[in-house]
């Protein structure tokens, strides 16, 4: 969810905002603002470093002063939730869970995210697993020290402590059954925080909402249904280019890819680790998921990346209200039929 240095921006900037929140604004800002003004609405957008990445909150609301206050409150909400769900900050509830192996009377937000994480682990047959943290730490330490992957025997040893089925979650306590286990919510918490922030902005009266948290994006508000946002999906072979544009009218989108945080130039080793084998998945280059929840899009894009094109695409087609695209290492694109309805 974040790096230790909050000022450091994550490289996981997979999607960019186009149309109203990106290219169209750069090319026609006056026209867009004129249309919003004539409707008696005001557009406010603010960018901050949060959750270890760039976060852009854009809203349209009836009153300018109120809109600015909404955006400030949105970042305050993110800060509060990050203080619960981060493993990188000291003395957060998640940090204490990893330190002790259990936490009594955990915050309800941590219970909710952990519970959902275990659900996605089950849905993906363990391809998404929040107990992968020890493997991530192993790879990070070896590449930082020697720019080389860890030896196989170390991977095999650490792999014994990775198993979502050894986590117990309820409102009274969260328990890790092995003393070697650690949890990372990096692949799900950012989406959860974005979801909660969008809901808060809707409750506050924002007409249109778009939040981009380093590629985890969510739209909301009645205005987004009537006038969807247009989002560009990056081409993993040429990350400065786009594979497609899709409309978000209340939906959420997330992408996982081997090019975002690669340990090696050939992308053989990257920041996504298969929790079942201990190595980076080798078949998919990028996975984009569009669904009704940023948390779900976040978790599923990671899990499907690990599952690979065949199993991952089958899962994507089975899930309700879920569309997406898988790009293989060979450059082939596999797109669900429903994504065409969202394409621009």
Language-model features, listed with the residues they occupy:
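Mature catalytic core of soluble alpha/beta enzymes
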Residues: 1-344
């Amino acid at each position: 969810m974040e790096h230790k240095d909050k000022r450091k921006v994550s490289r996981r900037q997979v999607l960019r905002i186009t149309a109203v929140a990106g290219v169209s604004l750069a090319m026609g800002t006056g026209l867009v603002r004129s249309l919003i003004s004539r409707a008696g609405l005001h557009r406010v957008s603010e960018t901050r470093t949060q959750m270890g990445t760039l976060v852009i909150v854009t809203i349209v609301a009836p009153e300018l002063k109120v809109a600015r206050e909404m955006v400030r409150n949105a970042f305050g909400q993110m800060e509060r939730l990050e203080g619960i769900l981060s493993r990188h900050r000291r003395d957060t509830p998640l940090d204490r869970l990893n330190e002790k192996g259990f936490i009594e009377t955990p915050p309800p937000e941590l219970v909710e995210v952990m519970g959902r994480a275990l659900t996605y682990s089950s849905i993906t047959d363990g391809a998404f697993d929040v107990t992968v943290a020890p493997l991530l730490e192993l790879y990070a330490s070896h590449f930082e020290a020697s720019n080389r992957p860890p030896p196989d025997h170390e991977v095999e040893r650490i792999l014994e402590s990775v198993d979502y089925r050894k986590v117990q979650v309820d409102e009274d306590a969260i328990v890790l059954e092995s003393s070697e286990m650690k949890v990372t919510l990096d692949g799900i918490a950012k989406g959860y925080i974005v979801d909660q922030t969008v809901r808060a902005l809707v409750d506050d009266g924002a007409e249109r909402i778009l939040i981009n948290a380093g590629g985890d994006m969510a739209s909301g508000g009645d205005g987004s249904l009537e006038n969807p946002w247009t989002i560009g999906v990056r081409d993993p072979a040429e990350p400065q280019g786009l594979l497609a544009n899709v409309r978000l009218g209340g939906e959420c989108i997330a992408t996982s890819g081997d090019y975002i945080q690669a340990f090696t130039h050939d992308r053989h080793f990257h920041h996504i680790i298969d929790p079942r084998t201990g190595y980076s998945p080798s078949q998919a280059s990028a996975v984009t998921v569009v669904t009704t929840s940023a948390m779900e899009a976040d978790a599923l894009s990671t899990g499907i990346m690990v599952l690979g094109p065949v199993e991952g695409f089958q899962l994507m087609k089975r899930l309700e209200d879920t569309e997406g695209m898988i790009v293989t290492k060979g450059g082939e694109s596999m797109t669900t039929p429903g994504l065409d309805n969202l394409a621009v």
